Amino acid sequence: MKKVKIIMIVMLTGIFSLHIRAQSVSTGLDLVSTYVWRGTKLSGASIQPLLQFTKGGFSIGSWGSAGFDGFLEMDLFARYAFNFGLTAGLTNYYFPGTNYFDYSKDTGSHGYEINLGYNMQGFSVSANYMLNEAGGAKTAGGDKYFELGYTRKNISLFAGAGDGWHTPTGEFGVVNLGLSATKELLISETFRVPVKLSAILNPTTKQYYLTAGITL
């Protein structure tokens, strides 16, 4: 629990210190028909805001999802992108409705995950590892997720597998197979809206999703 508190303090301190000397501040807002994360449906139609501070290859910020069905998720993240395609980071998952300051194993509300990714000429691979067990966040500790992807022009293919909170039983399985396509929707001569469509199959839960999203 003490280690988890230290991680949280470091992340929050980083947000404020980077805010002071940030070279780039970016915001974003996505509207999605269904919130599907790593092959699992977490909520229906959702609004997903982003606030990010960037300095060189380092970025830190907060991302959230607010579903019209009441589902809420508010995350903190920090990551560094190296110039040879490697990205390393840490994500703090939090789901409002639980005590934000509860870091215990039985009822803790935060899940801390190490994130590694590598991209090269359209190919991508990522590995993620959950550091802690937290009953409130439903993490088992040691949860793993791996994903392979390939992007060509506006089409992306992906395949992901994981265990822990990624599957109903906690056993390792393929959970995220799919295809995404992006296109800019012309609203006027000066205004375009990026649109993303995704077809997602979860072989473990035997569920299929077709989702749509726009970025404002």
State where each predicted segment sits:
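Cleavable N-terminal export/targeting peptides
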Residues: 1-24
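Hydrophobic, well-structured mid-protein blocks that either form specific transmembrane helices
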Residues: 85-140
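Outer-membrane beta-barrel "beta-signal"
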Residues: 118, 179-181, 185, 203-216
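Short glycine/proline- and aromatic-enriched beta-strand/turn motifs that initiate or cap beta-hairpins
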Residues: 23-68, 128
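Surface-exposed loop and membrane-interface regions of Gram-negative outer-membrane beta-barrel proteins
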Residues: 4, 58-83, 87-104
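Repeated loop/turn-to-beta-strand initiation elements of outer-membrane beta-barrel proteins
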Residues: 25-27, 57-62, 84-89, 120-127, ...
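Outer membrane beta-barrel transmembrane domains
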Residues: 156-187
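Solvent-exposed loop/turn segments connecting transmembrane beta-strands
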Residues: 37-45, 63-74, 101-110, 130-143, ...
